[in-house]
UniProtKB/Swiss-Prot annotation:
Family the entry assigns: Belongs to the peptidase C12 family.
PANTHER family: UBIQUITIN CARBOXYL-TERMINAL HYDROLASE
Site feature location: Important for enzyme activity: 192
Protein name: Probable ubiquitin carboxyl-terminal hydrolase
Length: 255
């Protein structure tokens, strides 16, 4: 058995991150993302609530429960894609998850690195170095690279302990899971490290990312209407105070 395979089978577990925008923002910025970017709450998928999300919003992170119904649909969809294929841009940055409870961190990585063309990085920070090191690697090799990275493991632990909720133990069962939605090359992709590949949810654009993600979530809700445990966060550029003042002024003038 190779050292890498032994690492995978050892199944390292981390403390789960809290679905808290402040926690994820601090975590992301500590790893080299410009302070111009932050996570914010998305309070619902109705059009009015989506309009409250600052623009640009370049990624959406969804926290949801893993149920038996979801797992059945997941395996069915994966089999269908394996048989029929799907459009998958080579520009999509996707990695597998080999660390227990690391889905929050992987959701942040997927959100950030699929927007490396618009997000500013610290040249010496984790994200820039990890992207440079892993761009040419396979999804499995990227996961192994993360598994071996002590810097992000330490940052994850610090952030996990900063949340407002009670901190679970590393080996405590967790049924909630983070996935990321991003727009790449004209399509909406769902990025979930538990799945073998990114899922293409159809045509999209930078402008319609929020609406298109909301449509996917609505389908999930329709399939299991009893399940209401969802949490949404957006990766957005911090609103410019001057721009906000101008917008308020325009609103007043149009009244």
């Amino acid at each position: 058995m190779s050292v890498d395979q032994e690492l995978i089978e050892t199944q390292k577990n981390w403390i789960p991150l809290e679905a808290n925008p402040e926690v994820l923002t601090t975590f992301m910025q500590s790893l080299g993302v410009s302070k111009d970017w932050e996570f914010c709450d998305i309070y619902g998928i109705d059009e009015g609530l989506l309009e409250m999300v600052p623009s640009p919003c370049v990624a959406v992170i969804l926290l949801f429960p893993i149920t038996n119904e979801y797992e059945d649909k997941r395996y069915k969809l994966e089999k269908e894609i394996e048989e029929k294929g799907q459009v998958l841009s080579d520009k999509v940055y996707f990695m597998k998850q080999y660390i227990g409870n690391a889905c929050g961190t992987i959701g942040v990585i997927h959100s950030v690195l699929n927007n490396a063309n618009v997000i500013e990085f610290n040249e010496n920070g984790f994200f820039k170095q990890f992207l440079d090191k892993t761009t040419s690697l396979s999804t499995e090799e990227r996961a192994i690279s993360l598994l071996k990275n002590s810097e992000i493991e330490k940052s994850h632990e610090i952030s996990a302990l900063q949340g407002q909720s009670n901190v679970p133990q590393e080996d405590e069962p967790v049924v909630l899971h983070f996935v990321s939605f991003v727009h790449v090359d004209g399509h909406l992709y769902e990025l979930d490290g538990r799945k073998p590949f990114a899922i293409n949810h159809g045509e999209s654009s930078a402008e319609t990312l929020l609406k298109d993600t909301a449509n996917v979530l609505q389908k999930m809700i329709d399939e299991d209407p009893k399940e209401i445990r969802f949490n949404l966060m957006g990766l957005v550029k911090k609103p410019n105070e001057e721009s906000e003042e101008e917008e308020e002024k325009e609103k007043e003038e149009t009244k």
